[in-house]
Amino acid sequence: MNQRLQRLADQIQRELAVLIRDAVNDPRLTGFVTISSVKVSPDLGYADVYVTIMEPELNDAMTMSNHEESIKVLNKAAGFLRTELSHSLKTRTTPRLRFHYDEVTARGNYMMDLISKAVIKTEENESDEQENEE
C-alpha cells in the first residue's frame, strides 16, 4: 500500500472509531468495538474495516453468533457511517465500507491465554518440586 493510501486508511480508522462510539446507537451492538486495521483499495472504491469486539463484562465470552450479529449491525450502518465520514475526508469520493471481524487479533488473544495458563502451570509444578525436595 502506498503512502497516500496508508494515510487515508489511518484517517478513516480514527474517524470511524469516533463515529462508531458516538453515533451508532444500535442496541444489538453490544460490547466495545475496536478498529484494528483499515485497508483501502487502490481506486478508493472500498475500505475493508477489520474490527474486534469485546464484551463489556470481563466474564462474558462472545460467541461467534454475537460477532456475526455485531458485524451485520456495522454493515447495515455502513451507509450512514460513509456519509458522516465524507464530511471529514478531503477526497472526491468516499470509499464504501465493508466490516469484517478480525480473526487474527482474536486468535492472538486466545494464544496469549494459552501461554499464560502454561506459564502458571509450569510455575506451580516447579514450586511443588521444590516443596518435595525439602
Swiss-Prot record:
Protein's cellular compartments: Cytoplasm
Domain of life (superkingdom): Bacteria
UniProt KW Nuclease keyword: no
Residue ranges that the Swiss-Prot or TrEMBL entry lists as coiled coil: none
Chief location: cytoplasm
Entry keywords, A to Z: Cytoplasm, Ribosome biogenesis
Pfam families cross-referenced by the UniProt entry: RBFA
GO BP, sorted A to Z: maturation of SSU-rRNA
Keyword hit for Membrane: no
GO cellular component, one term: cytosol
GO MF, any single term: ribosomal small subunit binding
InterPro entries for this protein: KH_dom-like_a/b, RbfA, RbfA_dom_sf
Summary of the function given for this chain in its UniProt record: One of several proteins that assist in the late maturation steps of the functional core of the 30S ribosomal subunit. Associates with free 30S ribosomal subunits (but not with 30S subunits that are part of 70S ribosomes or polysomes). Required for efficient processing of 16S rRNA. May interact with the 5'-terminal helix region of 16S rRNA.
Oligomer status and interactors: Monomer. Binds 30S ribosomal subunits, but not 50S ribosomal subunits or 70S ribosomes.
HAMAP family, per the entry: RbfA
Similarity section: Belongs to the RbfA family.
Protein name stated in the entry: Ribosome-binding factor A
Organism: Psychrobacter arcticus (strain DSM 17307 / VKM B-2377 / 273-4)
Gene behind this protein: rbfA
